[in-house]
């Protein structure tokens, strides 16, 4: 498949139904942080943008949601694919986007480089969509907070070594801060800024 043809293919076959399905899965995962949601819909974005990350983009992005992409994604067909299928524009400035996407293995900068919202409007922040190697099999972490009863153990594989430090700093500025969607293949795991994480 040529780079040009990749731009126009790989979106939802039934955009309304599939976007609604993905949206419900994401809302459920944000309401119950730490659970793994399996997306029942198929997206085939251009590499290196992953399947679940592409589905998130198709569901949440539109012309009112600027998007930031990692350097590798920016050099791929992903910017044109996202723009064609969602209408979202790509920005080079980290403090502007509503969503930021990272492919598997990409370096994730400090969360404070992105929009963190304000005390009055904490929702005006960036949601990071980060693909990891897997959502299980990594360093076990205990999650606590709203939507979590008695704690939950998560073990995403492929998080940066400094992730817990970044997350602790993010929680310290609540209600401001970023929210996080981890993806792997067709699955997602959501971590709102209210979730506290520590090593098991």
Swiss-Prot record:
Keywords tagged on the record: Plasmid, Transferase
Family to which this protein belongs: Belongs to the PhnH family.
Pfam families documented for this protein: PhnH
Name of this protein: Alpha-D-ribose 1-methylphosphonate 5-triphosphate synthase subunit PhnH
Source organism of the structure: Rhizobium meliloti (strain 1021) (Ensifer meliloti)
Enzyme Commission designation: 2.7.8.37
Catalyses which reaction(s): methylphosphonate + ATP = alpha-D-ribose 1-methylphosphonate 5-triphosphate + adenine
Domain of life: Bacteria
């Amino acid at each position: 498949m040529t780079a040009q043809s990749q731009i126009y293919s790989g979106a939802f076959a039934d955009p309304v139904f599939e976007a609604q399905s993905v949206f419900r899965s994401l809302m459920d995962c944000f309401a119950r942080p730490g659970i793994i949601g399996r997306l029942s819909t198929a997206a085939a974005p251009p590499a290196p943008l992953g399947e679940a990350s592409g589905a998130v983009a198709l569901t949440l992005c539109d012309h009112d949601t600027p998007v930031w992409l990692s350097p590798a994604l920016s050099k791929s067909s992903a910017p044109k694919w996202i723009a064609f299928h969602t209408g979202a524009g790509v920005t080079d400035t980290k403090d502007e986007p509503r969503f930021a996407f990272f492919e598997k293995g990409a370096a994730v900068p400090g969360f404070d480089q992105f929009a963190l919202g304000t005390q009055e409007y904490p929702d005006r922040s960036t949601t990071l969509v980060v693909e990891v190697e897997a959502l299980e099999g990594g360093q076990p972490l205990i999650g606590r907070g709203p939507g979590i009863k008695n704690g939950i153990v998560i073990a995403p594989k492929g998080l940066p070594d400094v992730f817990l430090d970044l997350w602790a700093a993010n929680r310290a500025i609540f209600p401001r801060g970023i929210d996080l969607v981890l993806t792997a293949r067709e699955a997602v795991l959501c971590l709102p800024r209210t979730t506290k994480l520590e090593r098991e």
